[in-house]
Amino acid sequence: MDVNPTLLFLKVPAQNAISTTFPYTGDPPYSHGTGTGYTMDTVNRTHQYSERGRWTKNTETGAPQLNPIDGPLPEDNEPSGYAQTDCVLEAMAFLEESHPGIFENSCIETMEIVQQTRVDKLTQGRQTYDWTLNRNQPAATALANTIEVFRSNGLMANESGRLIDFLKDVMESMDKEEMEITTHFQRKRRVRDNVTKKMVTQRTIGKKKQRLNKSSYLIRALTLNTMTKDAERGKLKRRAIATPGMQIRGFVYFVETLARSICEKLEQSGLPVGGNEKKAKLANVVRKMMTNSQDTEISFTITGDNTKWNENQNPRMFLAMITYITRNQPEWFRNILSIAPIMFSNKMARLGKGYMFESKSMKLRTQIPAEMIANIDLKYFNDSTRKKIEKIRPLLIDGTASLSPGMMMGMFNMLSTVLGVSILNLGQKRYTKTTYWWDGLQSSDDFALIVNAPNHAGIQAGVDRFYRTCKLLGINMSKKKSYINRTGTFEFTSFFYRYGFVANFSMELPSFGVSGINESADMSIGVTVIKNNMINNDLGPATAQMALQLFIKDYRYTYRCHRGDTQIQTRRSFEINKLWEQTRSKAGLLVSDGGPNLYNIRNLHIPEVCLKWELMDEDYQGRLCNPLNPFVSHKEIESVNNAVVMPAHGPAKNMEYDAVATTHSWVPKRNRSILNTSQRGILEDEQMYQRCCNLFEKFFPSSSYRRPVGISSMVEAMVSRARIDARIDFESGRIKKEDFTEIMKICSTIEELRRQK
């Protein structure tokens, strides 16, 4: 029988059909090769948008810099970065007028955070440009290397463990005439393998000292390394993203803390909240505009798109904003916040790995490193690359390009949101002083603009005024990519609004399935994803039940753990059948041990071990939850773990799931091949560093309000904390006298060892 597909939708309101338009099935595209070309594109484009600015030279590094601020007002619709300082300051003043005390209060909140933040804050984050090795490293390693170099150069403030003291060292380092660093290099030797008697190449890692003069050090401190953004859907061309070094990171963190605090108080800001909270915030703004427009006015909404948001923003504007926001604050606070934008006005973009050349005739491949681009003969390149290189050459120093204008992706999301909201704020009738008025939503570079007016001409005038106001602040609304609708239908940050936000369930499809971490985590993540989608994404009970059955089936095929009484033969079926026969209470077996599935949509919130605990045979309980089981290398078990879940588009989301430690929570061992490379020492450093940080967290958990105060090393802080805690526990009778004495003895031993060292 042929089914007419439209029948499927008879009972469904039109807006719910959005899930059927899902385009993102296969894998997203990844980038290969170097990002050098994309980075050059970014640098050249950024300069083009500001080309009518003023050129100056950085006195320390000799880098040419372009300053478009207060440049000529645009005469056409082309994107441009000529923000006008007085307009930005005025927008800030009006924002403060509409929200009395907002800047003052946010400054006070931020000042407290600045004084309490520990330097280990900078270990969060993934790849970071490590200026000592001139390449990317995990954040913890990059920080450790930076601190090590600082100390060997006599910069010791960081020993207190406070981020603000580490930043004092950064400031001092920039005044030094030279910095001595330790770099790694590789030696290769051919040696005979004792076991196989074959010749193998052995790599050893060497360390050597190197001196950087002031200008070389400054270039490295101001460098952003660039990579290609991976897994971006819906684009033909890849684009470059930046990762800053440790000198910049801390300052950026404090600026963003202040901006986040401001965004939290602005009803038009889509940051820093997310999910349902964000939807509620946005629905409020829409409701306000629609309520007011019922009788006399008409209301339209623009789903907005800005052209090259980052490349037209300017750090000098951010400096002006910060100067205004902190104008009544203590000098030290104003200084520390103004450093990030100043560093960004002097930033250098590292061009990445360089170009790969192939000679088809001679079957040769060779890499031209970025450092050589400045003086290599251009006849080897094709036309488009040649043009790029010619354009960028005047800006090059040591394989990095001077990039004063523009902001690179993802650096000041919160602060740029404040700038965007300040324009939305100007739409109130008391500022437009006419019949039209506007409001809207802003989240980094994404915006939705709601305009109300008595007639269509008024709407058009309102949109024009908004467009021109944006131009004055260096924001370029794209007329081609923005579209306008009657209020009630628009899209904002991939949320689709139609008389309320529509659940776009299909976006979550890629996160259903077995994650492949381990049997325990996968089961937990799988049911949590289904539970979360029932809560947040209109996943109905029948569909959820079906999703659950499909998940269990998928899980059993992945781990080859079909029920013990099934006929399916796999590699594990012999053991699983044996276990099934020996088990009295078969309902107690975990699914991963061939047991039945007891999950249904009512009990998804309970970890499987807890769900079946009462049903388990005693000896099975003992085997399952045995921390001494020699075959299982355990992670330290927290009650809640984090999984990274990939929606179809948008950033990877962090999802919490309950973790119960069993012998199924195994951790795969590290690939051995890394242990034979130059990374080995780095890996060991990283593990040691991680252990120290974890230990420190044990003493000062982030939930604790007793932060270590004053200038002390991490060890001293932990010892004094151990003593205080031990005394409290002893006096309240939680620990015995012997334990107390033992703890005190250990503390004294540690101090003694430190003194001898």
Curated annotation (Swiss-Prot):
GO-annotated molecular function: nucleotide binding; RNA binding; RNA-directed RNA polymerase activity
Source organism, top-level taxon: Viruses
Record key words, sorted: Eukaryotic host gene expression shutoff by virus, Eukaryotic host transcription shutoff by virus, Host cytoplasm, Host gene expression shutoff by virus, Host nucleus, Host-virus interaction, Inhibition of host RNA polymerase II by virus, Nucleotide-binding, Nucleotidyltransferase, Phosphoprotein, RNA-directed RNA polymerase, Transferase, Viral RNA replication, Viral transcription
Region (Disordered): 50-82
GO cellular component terms attached to this protein's record: host cell cytoplasm; host cell nucleus
Record's catalysed reaction(s): RNA(n) + a ribonucleoside 5'-triphosphate = RNA(n+1) + diphosphate
PTM note: Phosphorylated by host PRKCA.
EC number: 2.7.7.48
Subunit organization: Influenza RNA polymerase is composed of three subunits: PB1, PB2 and PA. Interacts (via N-terminus) with PA (via C-terminus). Interacts (via C-terminus) with PB2 (via N-terminus); this interaction is essential for transcription initiation. Interacts (via C-terminus) with human PKP2 (via N-terminus); the interaction competitively inhibits the interaction between the RNA polymerase subunits PB1 and PB2.
Family (UniProt): Belongs to the influenza viruses polymerase PB1 family.
UniProt-recorded name of the protein: RNA-directed RNA polymerase catalytic subunit
Gene for this chain: PB1
